[in-house]
Amino acid sequence: KNEIPTLGEVRGKAVLATRFDDKLPVGFERCGLYFGWADQGDRTIRADPTADSVINDRETLCVQDRYNYDVDDKITAIHTCLDNSRAADDTFFLNFTSTSGSGKVGHPKEYAKHINLDLYDYDWQAGTAYGIVIVDFAPKKIAEKIYQTNFQPAQ
């Protein structure tokens, strides 16, 4: 299908997603989901660090991929995207937690240590659709916290 599937529809299956522009010959149809968004590699700090786009020219896509922000600015960008996703049921979110920062630390794994500590302490809400959160060097405890948001809170 050329639309965003539900989790139930894709359980146990692969979903193809691309970001490159595939010029197809006449008569061929694009396969999978096309995620196109503008590069976010500049270091300009923005009140809204996300970029809005569309998936397959139909569904709204919101992406946070500020990969050159320093740790504190990156954490703010991640939180902004997570908080915005709570209020937008009709938008698909991609939230990249990775950064290469200013290069002062030297390796993305060092940045990830700081960001992952913050992610662990974030107020994750059960039953909330955060979209896809892409985490570098994620320890099991963070993966579990994010995974648990897929379930409704106990009554």
Task: Name every feature range the model reports, one short phrase each.
Residues 1-155:
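Catalytic cores of phosphodiester-bond hydrolases, prominently lipid phosphodiesterases
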